[in-house]
């Protein structure tokens, strides 16, 4: 029988970034503090030790098995009076209670009902939603109060809906068991199948688990007053189609007490996200191995102590930082639950609603631009223009930093010079945190940020992939921002932004440069080698006066040309930065040695194949 609840307005509270930090697949050694500005001394924190082997990154066979036996399953037909055909479940008016392990096929519609799973702690329950429509006025539509694990399977060809009310609270449970989602589980929760599920989390979250939340298939449309998908211990997604609109975080894992939990791992799926706060927020690690992720609106895109991008396609439009690696003690906001903990790795290697972002700003428009591999056109750049879509990119091969089996790299980036600064790079920032890391091993990544494009309070490692950043136009942020070192050993990068706090890489086995060059939204930005052959290009999404470039074809000590709207700037690429500092001074000399600027009204490179990164 459904417990009665007192009605209480359930308004979303301002989200604070709480972070503990873990490192996915990294060993444990401290990161050297880089040089800092003479007027501001860098401080660096040391985190706790962890072992990636302790993290459960896998999917069980049962997670991925959406099959069921229709003949032996108990059939539940919803309505004003529910009907149960089989054992293990009972009906009380419109409400249904499941008390035994087994498979239950749920169909029909109920305007005020709850499906309650209350089983023994070792029971596994499979709920097959086959055109089920459940709305509950005083609690979750589906509430797994107790079980070992619950599997929610979306039957082939089915269309399902679950919704809760705008406000409710429990009166006969302690607060620790209060359900906080339209589909809520106290136990591990797995969703699979090929059908569709629409979730309206009118009170708080859309889909939530106090343990693991695993999704291996299905099509999901989630609207939530707070978070869209939340798995306290972890969120793991193998496949699916997702449209998530949330007032706070779209996808979140919030365990800040266990160094092996609190992570998000995405292995596939097609994602469209509109979030009032973070698109993906993990207390420890965020890992993207595959999938097509489009974040149309957010405050910050990917946020965790450590962010690993190993593949897939990422497109993020953010009103603050697009990617942010920060621990609890170094993130920009905290709440009472913040323990301020952090974890080490081996470096060898605000309420919102409507269309406003977390900072109250209208989200920037999705930029248009080319995103292709380094060009293979003829040396005179005469091949025809083959523009691509905004967020797609040509196929590429990761030459360095490839991680076997799509696991995070074992801190394989190259360490930076202790006084690495601007080529235009920066040494160490204030509040540097050695536990924080952004590591890019593959994939196609396009970022449009009003704040920093990538902000790591620790290190940044680019080992492969294609990275395009349309950074800030304000002087207080940069396309790249890091606290200790930034290294590049592979991949392709074009990062455009303002020069006020600009940083480039601190070192790498692949040559790079920061170039002082200005352009406007819509301008074609082209990198040419000494023979005039285009090696990379992109169409700017917004104004900029600084560019950081690096491709697999660039060599240390070799001269290149950056062409912006017919204006050419020559520069020399290097594998090391040339001066220390906080990164607040703009491009460094090595990144643009005695640049020779010229105006060329006939930009032949505009006729070459599109490409950047």
Language-model region placement:
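A composition-driven surface/loop motif
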Residues: 2-613
């Amino acid at each position: 029988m459904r417990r009665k609840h007192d009605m209480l307005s359930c308004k979303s509270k301002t989200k604070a970034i709480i972070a503990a930090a873990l490192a996915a697949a990294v060993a444990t050694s401290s990161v050297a503090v880089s040089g800092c500005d003479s007027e501001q001394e860098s401080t660096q924190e040391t985190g706790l030790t962890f072992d990636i082997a302790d993290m459960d990154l896998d999917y069980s066979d049962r997670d991925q098995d959406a099959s069921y036996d229709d003949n032996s399953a108990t059939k539940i037909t919803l309505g004003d009076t529910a009907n149960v055909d089989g054992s293990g479940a009972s009906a009380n008016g419109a409400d249904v209670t499941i008390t035994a392990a087994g498979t239950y096929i749920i169909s029909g519609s109920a305007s005020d009902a709850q499906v309650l799973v209350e089983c023994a702690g070792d029971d596994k329950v499979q709920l097959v939603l086959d055109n089920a429509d459940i709305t509950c006025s005083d609690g979750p539509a589906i509430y797994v109060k107790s079980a070992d694990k619950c599997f929610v399977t979306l039957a082939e060809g089915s269309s399902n809906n679950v919704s809760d009310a705008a406000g409710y609270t429990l009166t006969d449970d302690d607060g620790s068991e209060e359900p906080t989602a339209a589909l809520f589980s106290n136990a591990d929760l797995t969703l699979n199948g090929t059908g569709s599920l629409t979730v309206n989390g009118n009170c708080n979250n859309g889909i939530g688990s106090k343990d693991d939340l695993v999704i291996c298939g299905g099509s999901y449309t989630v609207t939530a007053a707070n978070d869209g998908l939340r798995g306290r211990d972890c969120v793991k997604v193998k496949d699916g189609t997702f449209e998530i609109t949330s007032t706070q975080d779209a996808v979140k894992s919030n365990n800040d007490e266990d160094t092996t939990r609190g992570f998000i791992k995405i292995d596939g799926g097609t994602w469209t996200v509109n979030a009032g706060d973070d698109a993906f927020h993990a207390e420890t690690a965020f890992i993207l191995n595959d999938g097509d992720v489009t974040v149309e609106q957010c405050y910050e895109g990917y946020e965790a102590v450590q962010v690993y991008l190993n593949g897939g396609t990422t497109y993020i439009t953010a009103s603050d930082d697009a990617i942010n690696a920060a621990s609890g003690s170094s993130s920009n906001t905290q709440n009472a639950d913040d323990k301020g903990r952090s974890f080490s790795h081996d470096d060898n290697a605000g309420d919102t609603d409507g269309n406003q972002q977390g900072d109250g700003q209208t989200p920037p428009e999705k930029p248009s631009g080319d995103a292709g591999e380094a060009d293979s056109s003829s040396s005179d750049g005469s091949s025809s223009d083959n523009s691509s879509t905004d967020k797609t990119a040509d196929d590429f091969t990761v030459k360095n930093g490839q991680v076997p089996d799509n696991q995070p790299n074992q801190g394989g980036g190259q360490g930076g010079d202790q006084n690495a600064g601007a080529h235009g790079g920066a040494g160490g920032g204030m509040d540097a945190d050695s536990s924080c890391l952004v590591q890019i091993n593959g994939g196609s990544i396009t970022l449009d940020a009003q704040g920093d494009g990538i902000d790591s309070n620790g290190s940044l490692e680019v080992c492969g992939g294609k990275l395009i950043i349309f950074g800030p136009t304000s002087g207080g942020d940069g396309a790249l921002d890091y606290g200790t070192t930034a290294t590049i050993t592979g991949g392709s990068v074009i990062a455009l932004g303002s020069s006020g706090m600009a940083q480039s890489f601190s070192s790498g086995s692949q040559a790079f440069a920061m170039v002082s060059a200005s352009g406007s939204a819509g301008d074609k930005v082209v990198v040419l080698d000494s023979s005039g052959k285009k090696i990379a290009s992109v169409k700017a999404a917004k104004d900029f006066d600084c560019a950081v470039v690096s491709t697999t074809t660039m060599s240390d000590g070799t001269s290149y040309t950056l062409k912006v709207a017919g204006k050419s700037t020559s520069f020399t690429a290097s594998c090391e930065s040339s001066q220390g500092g906080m990164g607040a001074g703009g491009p460094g000399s090595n990144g643009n040695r005695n640049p020779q600027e010229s105006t060329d009204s006939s930009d032949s490179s505009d006729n070459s194949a599109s490409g950047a990164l």
